[in-house]
Amino acid sequence: SLFSLIKAGAKFLGKNLLKQGACYAACKASKQC
C-alpha cells in the first residue's frame, strides 16, 4: 500500500540522515572537514 511505501521511504531517509550526521560529527571531531 501507499502508506507502507511512505513509511519505508521515511525509514530509509532517516537512516541516511543519521549516517550523514555521524560522518559530519566525526569529521568535526577530527577537524578533517
Swiss-Prot record:
Is Secreted found in the keyword set? yes
Q: What is its main location?
A: secreted
Q: Name one GO biological process term.
A: defense response to bacterium
Indicate where this protein resides in the cell: Secreted
Tell me the disulfide pairings in this chain.
Answer: C27-C33
* Assembly and oligomerization: Monomer.
Which protein is depicted? Gaegurin-1
